[in-house]
Amino acid sequence: MDSTFLASLVSGAAAGTSTDVVFFPIDTLKTRLQAKGGFFHNGGYRGIYRGLGSAVVASAPGASLFFVTYDSMKQQLRPVMGRWTASEQLAEVLTHMLSSSLGEMSACLVRVPAEVIKQRTQTHHTNSSLQTLRLILRDPTGEGVVRGLYRGWWTTIMREIPFTCIQFPLYEYLKKKWAAYAEIERVSAWQGAVCGSLAGGIAAAATTPLDVLKTRMMLHERRVPMLHLARTLFREEGARVFFRGIGPRTMWISAGGAIFLGVYEAVHSLF
């Protein structure tokens, strides 16, 4: 097996699982803040580990898919981008944006069904991830099992691609600048964690409105067009609704970015 592929596979799995387990309670609080009816109506501080099962099951394969795609596409796209533009910095930014976007789309094949199950369990639609999955498989709304599991797919993609287009070029830029400043070839795991935290926090705050839309679509009883939902939310709850949960989301992803990318760098350095 190719060493780069194996390094990305194992590093991604370790990073994804550790981050989701540590920060799951904050994600639960964020989801309940964004859900219709508000925080306490959807469970408040009770059962903040509800839905953890689906998150853990999806963490390793989802993160592995992302990094395998991201790292392999970086190697393939960098020479291509270098031929398209004379600016080395622009070529690097475009490479990281495209590679991370393709990585996110791959990861969402696993992540979206897990998110649907997790968020419905977090907001007390059911008592466990397994019970939520069984309910979706019974297809009570008649929309179809696959449609039910992948509800909010495009909204998730529309949230994740802007997020990753901000996070990973910024993350790679900060790492490069830090390495140049310290006169080292590659940043250490803790330095990568700091860069990941800064990049993740900025990207999280900027994409909160898309995250709110994604959460509402996944929790809605039936499929609803995204623009229709956005207009309804604005009319009924005002513009502030699109920034609900920005604090927990930014805090969670900023701290999560430190662990996610710190663990990734630490494990990757072993190969």
Curated annotation (Swiss-Prot):
Alphabetized, the UniProt keywords read: Membrane, Mitochondrion, Mitochondrion inner membrane, Repeat, Transmembrane, Transmembrane helix, Transport
Solcar repeat segments? 3-76, 91-177, 187-270
Q: What name has this protein been given in UniProt?
A: Putative mitochondrial carrier protein PET8
Q: Has the keyword Membrane been applied to this entry? A: yes
Query: Which PROSITE patterns has this protein been placed in?
Result: SOLCAR
Organism the protein comes from: Eremothecium gossypii (strain ATCC 10895 / CBS 109.51 / FGSC 9923 / NRRL Y-1056) (Yeast)
Primary location group? mitochondrion
InterPro entries found in the cross-reference section: Mit_carrier, Mitochondrial_sb/sol_carrier, Mt_carrier_dom_sf
Q: List GO molecular-function terms, semicolon-separated.
A: S-adenosyl-L-methionine transmembrane transporter activity
**A GO CC term?**
mitochondrial inner membrane
Signal sequence residues: none
- Gene3D superfamilies per the record? Mitochondrial carrier domain
Question: Where is this chain's protein located in or outside the cell?
Answer: Mitochondrion inner membrane
Q: What family, per the record? A: Belongs to the mitochondrial carrier (TC 2.A.29) family.
**Pfam families recorded for this chain?**
Mito_carr
